[in-house]
């Protein structure tokens, strides 16, 4: 049997020839498609079903030049149509209406464009549009269609032919073309959006609606295009369809389109979504079983939060609970990455701007969620935004109490000096809708307003035209926080209201402006907490005080005055006095502000911004505030109770703090001296430190107390012993060492090394009871010319022999003393001191101790030598060490380092150190 003869339409060339002929571009062209529909229809059908769908068929069709006649065919049907104003309410560009067409073709075109198209012509147009839409799935074809001007015919067909199938394929072709940014721009310029919107409202076919929705989604490829779509009313029909769409496929397409249109949500987009009734359906879709629809709906709700006008309605629809639940799910251990949490965090923070949504958020556990974000180091980039959101709860007493219980205050204090991400700037549309603005157009600004604005700028009340709007009113402006009196001292002004940085060219304002930087929201919340009747539990703690002080001293410019007012408010509150004592807060204020030593600067100093005079003034003012509280009847009772009946830790803290905040002699003498506060503090030095700066605080406290006990004491440096004297005392032992000694020695002391040292028997016996008994008594050594001295090295024996022969101040006592930096334990100096005690030479002991003190405890000496000297265990040297440590005028850091060395040297034997320090403080040292 013979094989079947191949059809003509199996040939791509035949199909292209038919297409070219129908388009009027080849031999015999210009035939009316209505009279030539049968061969053309077969060719178009073959192109769509076989040639285009074959492997690389679209590329072959494009390479063989098929797009040009295809577009020409579409152009012929679209060019001679009625004016756009007659066909639709929208308007197409004039180029569409003026496209050229031959008079002979007009009747056919008119018949094509009638509302009831002939079946064959409609089928031809359907096939041609289907082929074009399929071809536009590839980038090369999209580029060529745009180059050949194929967008305008599609817009005209969309405008004029209202058949669902043709609208469907036209929208599909436009949607495919919109995948290229250049084509998307041309489609917008061609005026396709109004016709797509019109078709969206008129069409009933689900497939057609999906194609139109997809085209609108692809046209929303940039912020400018999204805004244009919203301004042309494309969002509301989508929202209305979402509220009534029964088709799951259409619902998915609508959600995807609305997600794209709501990115960077504009005011017009939010208004249309709300008016279209989409908020409720979106909240319902947030629990859809399909993940793609569910997540898209949630992201649309998150995007809508950028517009304040829609947030109250969004909360009424249940959006607050949906967003909180999704953010909680994504932050769970099995949740998603932080990048997917960002839009939800932003949305939840924006929801805190309206009171009604804050109430819903609080009831739905949103405060705990926000606190979890603040406690998460991995979410540090969002911390400024979260803190700014919590400012909305500033006057919600219940929420503030919960936030305080959850540990907000230490997190805020850490926020003041931490390196966190910057808060993203929001537009004016994101402002709270609790006080909606009456929008005034620029054209409506009257001359009176312009005159007012110019006057405000000239007087310095506004920096520029943008600082004040026509909608400004005194009711909308928050009153500045009053600068309350913080201290009766006259030195409070400069730090309580520091100068603000002035921008170049800025006219000084009549009232100083408070800087509002990244720390502004945190300080506002801390200020609110400080206004509580008893804020000590939250703010008078180590972390809170450290955060405030780190901000005040570390700010590159003048700190925010609110931080200074917080500190002043706390120190003026009697309810905070005990907390300042228990937490070493007063000592911290003095160390950080007055002395310039922070916890990070101890024991190794670190470079940081220095404004010492202003900081010192602030510290003295705050301590004066605490002094006023401490010396009041309430303060006296509180301190007495704390010292006598408090816990051991509180008693030590009270004893340490009293010299800083008590100036009345009757008070500090009774508490520290009569009731044992000083001895309690000294005993605690050798116990585990309750604070990282405890020894620094203790050294400073003892020095202050010494100044209170002896207020007229002034630094009296010890006279340095010159190593080379201009007229040294004569050495009485040196004549015995020459080749011709005079007088001649009558005995020699023999050391363990065999060295023989000459001596006079009578002088040695007269200088020491030990040698008197040894050399003049009944011992065998009294009859010997070579007397052994066991356990004595030459270096240690040298000052002994000099002293036995009457040398005083000849420099021999300095010989065994090592230079600073070398240990004294095990040195010749220690051996000489032991020998002086063994040989009953107290004057030599004193001379050696004085030599050690003058070399290692000179005014220019280092604190590391103090502990070395104390380790020798000599009472006089211990007193010398205590005197050097607490010497008036001593550097605070050196004093603290010296006390640290003394504590380490004392070990568990605290008695000698306690007695030495007590004697120096009380001024009773011998």
From Swiss-Prot:
Residues 745-813 form the BTB domain. Residues 82-104 have a biased composition (Low complexity). It is found in: Nucleus; Chromosome; Cytoplasm. Ubiquitinated by a BCR (BTB-CUL3-RBX1) E3 ubiquitin ligase complex, leading to its degradation. Deubiquitinated by USP7. Induction: In CD4(+) T-cells, mRNA expression is induced 2h after CD3E plus CD28 stimulation, then subsides and remains low between 24 and 72h post-activation. It comes from the Eukaryota. Residues 484-499 have a biased composition (Polar residues). Keywords: Chromosome, Cytoplasm, Nucleus, Phosphoprotein, Repeat, Ubl conjugation, Ubl conjugation pathway. InterPro entries: ARM-like (IPR011989), ARM-type_fold (IPR016024), ARM_ARMC5 (IPR055445), Armadillo (IPR000225), BTB/POZ_dom (IPR000210), SKP1/BTB/POZ_sf (IPR011333). Disruption phenotype: Embryonic lethality, with its severity depending on genetic background of the mice: embryonic lethality becomes more severe with higher degrees of genetic background purity. Knockout mice are small in body size. They have compromised T-cell proliferation and differentiation into Th1 and Th17 cells, increased T-cell apoptosis, reduced severity of experimental autoimmune encephalitis, and defective immune responses to lymphocytic choriomeningitis virus infection. They develop adrenal gland hyperplasia in old age. Expression is high in the thymus, stomach, bone marrow and lymphatic tissues (including lymph nodes and intestinal wall). Also expressed in the adrenal gland, skin and in brain structures, with noticeable levels found in the cerebellum. Residues 82-111, 472-516 are annotated as: Disordered. One of its GO terms (molecular function) is ubiquitin-like ligase-substrate adaptor activity. The modification Phosphoserine is found at residue 337. ARM repeats lie at residues 139-179, 181-221, 223-263, 267-306, 307-354, 355-399, 401-440. GO terms for cellular component: chromatin; Cul3-RING ubiquitin ligase complex; cytoplasm; cytosol; focal adhesion; membrane; nucleoplasm. Pathway: Protein modification; protein ubiquitination. GO terms for biological process: adrenal cortex development; CD4-positive, alpha-beta T cell differentiation; defense response to virus; gastrulation; hemopoiesis; in utero embryonic development; mesoderm formation; proteasome-mediated ubiquitin-dependent protein catabolic process. Substrate-recognition component of the BCR(ARMC5) E3 ubiquitin ligase complex, at least composed of CUL3, ARMC5 and RBX1. Substrate-recognition component of a BCR (BTB-CUL3-RBX1) E3 ubiquitin ligase complex that terminates RNA polymerase II (Pol II) transcription in the promoter-proximal region of genes. The BCR(ARMC5) complex provides a quality checkpoint during transcription elongation by driving premature transcription termination of transcripts that are unfavorably configured for transcriptional elongation: the BCR(ARMC5) complex acts by mediating ubiquitination of Pol II subunit POLR2A phosphorylated at 'Ser-5' of the C-terminal domain (CTD), leading to POLR2A degradation. This is Armadillo repeat-containing protein 5. It comes from Mus musculus (Mouse).
């Amino acid at each position: 049997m013979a094989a079947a003869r191949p059809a003509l339409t199996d040939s791509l060339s035949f199909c292209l020839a038919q297409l070219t002929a129908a388009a009027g571009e080849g031999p015999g062209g210009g035939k009316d498609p209505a009279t030539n529909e049968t061969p053309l229809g077969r060719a178009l059908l073959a192109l769509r079903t076989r040639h285009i769908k074959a492997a690389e068929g679209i590329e072959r069709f494009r390479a063989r030049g098929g797009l040009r006649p295809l577009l020409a065919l579409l152009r012929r049907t679209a060019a001679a149509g009625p004016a756009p104003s007659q066909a639709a309410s929208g308007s197409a560009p004039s180029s569409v209406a003026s496209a050229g067409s031959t008079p002979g073709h007009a009747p056919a075109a008119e018949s094509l464009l009638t509302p009831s198209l002939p079946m064959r012509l409609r089928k031809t147009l359907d096939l041609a549009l289907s082929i074009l839409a399929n071809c536009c799935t590839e980038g090369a074809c999209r580029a060529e269609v745009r180059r050949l001007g194929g967008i305008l015919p599609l817009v005209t067909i969309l405008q004029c032919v209202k058949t669902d199938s043709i609208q469907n394929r036209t929208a599909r072709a436009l949607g495919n073309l919109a995948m290229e940014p250049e084509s998307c721009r041309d489609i917008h310029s061609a005026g396709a959006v109004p016709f797509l919107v019109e078709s969206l409202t008129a069409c009933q076919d689900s497939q057609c609606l999906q194609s139109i929705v997809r085209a609108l989604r692809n046209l929303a490829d940039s912020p400018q295009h999204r805004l244009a779509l919203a301004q042309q009313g494309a969002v509301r029909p989508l929202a209305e369809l979402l509220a009534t769409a029964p088709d799951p496929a259409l619902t998915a397409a609508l959600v995807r389109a609305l997600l794209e249109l709501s990115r960077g949500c504009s005011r017009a987009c939010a208004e249309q979504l709300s008016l279209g009734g989409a908020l409720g359906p979106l909240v319902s879709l947030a629990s859809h079983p399909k993940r793609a629809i569910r997540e898209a709906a949630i992201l649309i709700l998150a995007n809508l939060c950028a517009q304040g006008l829609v947030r109250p309605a969004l909360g009424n629809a249940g959006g607050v609970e949906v967003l909180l639940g999704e953010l909680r799910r994504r932050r769970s251990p099995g949740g998603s990455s932080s990048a997917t949490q960002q839009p939800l965090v932003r949305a939840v923070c924006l929801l805190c701007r309206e009171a009604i949504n804050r109430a819903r958020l609080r009831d739905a556990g949103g405060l705990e969620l926000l606190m979890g974000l603040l406690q998460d180091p991995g979410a540090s980039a969002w911390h400024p935004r979260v803190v700014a959101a919590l400012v909305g709860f500033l006057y919600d007493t219940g929420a503030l109490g919960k936030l305080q219980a959850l540990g907000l205050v230490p997190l805020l204090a850490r926020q003041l000096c931490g390196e966190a991400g910057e808060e993203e700037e929001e537009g004016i549309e994101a402002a709270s809708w609790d006080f909606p603005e009456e929008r005034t157009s620029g054209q409506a600004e009257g001359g009176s307003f312009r005159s007012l604005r110019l006057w405000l700028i000239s007087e310095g009340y506004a920096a520029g035209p943008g600082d004040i709007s026509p909608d400004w009113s005194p009711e909308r402006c928050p009153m500045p926080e009053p600068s309350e009196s913080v201290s009766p001292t006259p030195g409070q002004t400069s730090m309580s209201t520091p100068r603000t940085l002035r921008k170049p060219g800025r006219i000084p304002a009549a009232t100083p402006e408070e800087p509002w930087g990244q720390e502004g929201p945190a300080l506002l919340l801390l200020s609110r907490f400080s206004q509580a009747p008893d804020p000590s539990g939250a703010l008078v703690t180590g972390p809170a005080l450290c955060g405030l002080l780190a901000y005040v001293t570390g700010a590159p410019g003048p700190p925010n005055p609110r931080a200074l007012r917080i500190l002043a408010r706390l120190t003026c509150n009697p309810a905070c006095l005990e907390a300042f004592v228990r937490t070493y807060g007063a000592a911290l204020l003095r160390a950080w502000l007055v002395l310039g030593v922070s916890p990070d600067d101890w024991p190794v100093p670190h470079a940081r911004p220095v404004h010492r005079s202003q900081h010192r003034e602030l510290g003295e003012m705050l301590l004066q505030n605490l002094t006023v509280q401490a010396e009041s009847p309430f303060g006296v009772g509180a301190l007495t109770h704390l010292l006598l009946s408090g816990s051991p830790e509180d008693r030590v803290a009270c004893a340490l703090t009293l010299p800083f905040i008590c100036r009345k002699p009757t008070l500090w003498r009774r508490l520290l001296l009569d009731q044992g506060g000083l001895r309690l503090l000294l005993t605690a030095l050798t116990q585990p430190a309750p604070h990282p700066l405890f020894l620094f605080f203790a050294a400073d406290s003892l020095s202050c107390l010494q100044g209170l006990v002896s207020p007229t004491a002034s630094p009296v440096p010890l006279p340095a012993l010159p190593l080379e004297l201009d007229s040294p005392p004569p050495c009485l032992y040196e004549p015995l060492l020459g080749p011709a000694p005079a007088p001649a020695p009558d005995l020699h002391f023999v050391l363990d090394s065999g060295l023989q040292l000459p001596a006079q028997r009578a002088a040695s016996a007269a200088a020491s009871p030990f040698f008197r008994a040894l050399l003049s008594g009944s011992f065998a050594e009294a009859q010997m010319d070579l007397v052994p001295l066991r356990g004595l090295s030459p270096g240690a024996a040298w000052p002994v022999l000099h002293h036995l022969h009457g040398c005083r101040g000849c420099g021999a006592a300095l010989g065994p003393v090592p230079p600073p930096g070398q240990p004294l334990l095990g040195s010749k100096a220690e051996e000489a001191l032991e020998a002086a005690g063994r040989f009953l030479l107290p004057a030599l002991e004193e001379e050696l101790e004085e030599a050690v003190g003058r070399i290692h405890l000179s005014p220019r000496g280092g604190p590391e030598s103090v502990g070395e000297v104390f380790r020798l265990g000599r009472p006089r040297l211990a007193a010398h060490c205590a005197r050097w440590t607490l010497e008036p005028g001593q550097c605070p850091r050196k004093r603290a380092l010296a006390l640290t060395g003394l504590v380490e040297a004392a070990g568990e034997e605290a008695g000698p150190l306690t007695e030495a320090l007590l004697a120096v403080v009380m001024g009773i040292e011998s």
